[in-house]
Regions:
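Bacterial N-terminal signal peptides
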Residues: 17-29
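Sequence/structural signature of beta-propeller domains
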Residues: 36-340
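Sec/Tat signal peptide C-region and signal peptidase I cleavage site
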Residues: 31-35
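N-terminal secretory signal peptides that target proteins for export/translocation
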Residues: 1-14
Length: 340
């Protein structure tokens, strides 16, 4: 597998050189959270942002663009879109609030299109999904709709690579799931057209055994490209990561990484893949109403995942998770910001 950095990461790093020192100075000087959250040396943490009830609360997805951090707050909106709205908060690197955006429904997916620098905001992971694309520079936005999902649920997360955008098909209606688990998305007027690239019952190679297995993806959730260019999907309730090499191509290959701690299956949410050894991991503790900044002298080469109450280091060869920051309530969204 090739080892390359995405265009978005390279561009972000070049833009970051002047201000990341300020970010780390603020993070290092901020007040740490209560004693219930602890870090295993050499890791340390501090508070980057907190909820501001009743205006915005339940922080989840995190995106970074042009020296800014965007965090989606769910505000207890219904994940099927039947009631409520979410707030997207734009922060400076020192944690100060710049502006906020309101979207109807429950926001779960939040990514920046590296080609247009527009913010893609995806709502309603259980049913009735919609997409809002926002230009943070002028606050212009446009809403897009989906046809009724073939798998019967909603859409959860997005991942960009080149000209392609992929979306995870969440909350499937059937067990076994024979419908789409990952789709390729195309904007068409005010509509999002989707084409399946992975079905819920596809075959895969289990990385821990080398044997072929048939998947039954019951909870497609968070999704991200790793540093090698592979698309990595978290099937949360199934306690496994699904790795797609050459996603959407005729030579696409699929791998399964079963997740565990002490031989017990573990469900995770987001996963980040530090492509350089120095940086900071932002992680949102949704029900703890806090976004933490986690630092270490060196990161890597392993990724890090949001486990039920901790931030864990993940061995992709074995699927074993090892806590490095513990005592959170419910970690969800994550983002790795590299140092220049």
């Amino acid at each position: 597998m090739k080892s390359v950095l995405s265009t978005a990461t390279r561009n972000f790093r070049f833009r970051s050189m002047a201000f990341l020192a300020v970010f780390f100075a603020v993070v290092a000087g901020s007040v740490t959270a209560g004693a219930q959250v602890t870090a295993l040396p050499p890791y340390s943490f501090s508070v980057f942002a907190t909820s501001k009830k009743p205006h915005y609360y339940q922080p989840d997805s995190i995106a970074v663009w042009n020296n800014r951090v965007f965090i989606g707050y769910g505000n207890n909106a219904k994940p099927d879109g039947t009631s409520g709205s979410s707030t997207i908060v734009e922060y400076a690197m020192d944690g100060s609030v710049i502006q906020t955006f309101t979207v109807k429904g429950h926001n779960d997916g939040l990514k920046v299109d590296p080609k247009t620098n527009l913010l893609w905001v995806l709502q309603n992971e259980d049913a009735n999904p919609n997409l809002v694309i926002i230009d943070p520079r002028n606050r212009r936005s446009k809403k897009y709709t989906f046809s009724k999902p073939a798998h019967g649920g909603g859409y959860d997360d997005m991942a960009f690579e080149g000209d392609q955008v992929y979306i995870s098909a969440s909350n499937p209606a059937n067990n076994p799931n024979t419908q789409q688990a990952i789709v390729k998305a195309t904007l068409n007027g005010n509509h999002v057209d989707v084409t399946p690239i992975l079905l819920g019952d596809s075959n895969a190679i289990d990385v821990t055994t080398g044997q072929q297995v048939q998947l039954n993806l019951q909870d497609p959730d968070s999704m991200r490209f790793d540093a090698a260019g592979d698309l990595v999907l978290d099937s949360q309730a199934d306690a496994e990561l699904i790795v797609l090499h050459h996603p959407g191509a005729v030579n696409q290959t699929v791998y399964r990484v079963p997740l565990s701690t002490n031989n017990t299956a573990v469900q995770i949410d987001d996963t980040v893949f530090p492509e350089v050894s120095q940086g900071v991991i932002l992680v949102s503790d949704r029900d703890g109403e806090t976004v933490y900044a986690v630092t270490a002298p060196l990161f890597g080469p392993d990724p890090f995942s949001a486990a039920p109450t901790s931030l864990d280091q993940l061995n992709m060869s074995t699927g074993v998770l090892t806590p490095v920051v513990s005592g959170m309530v419910s970690p969800h969204g994550m983002y790795f910001i590299p140092t220049p």
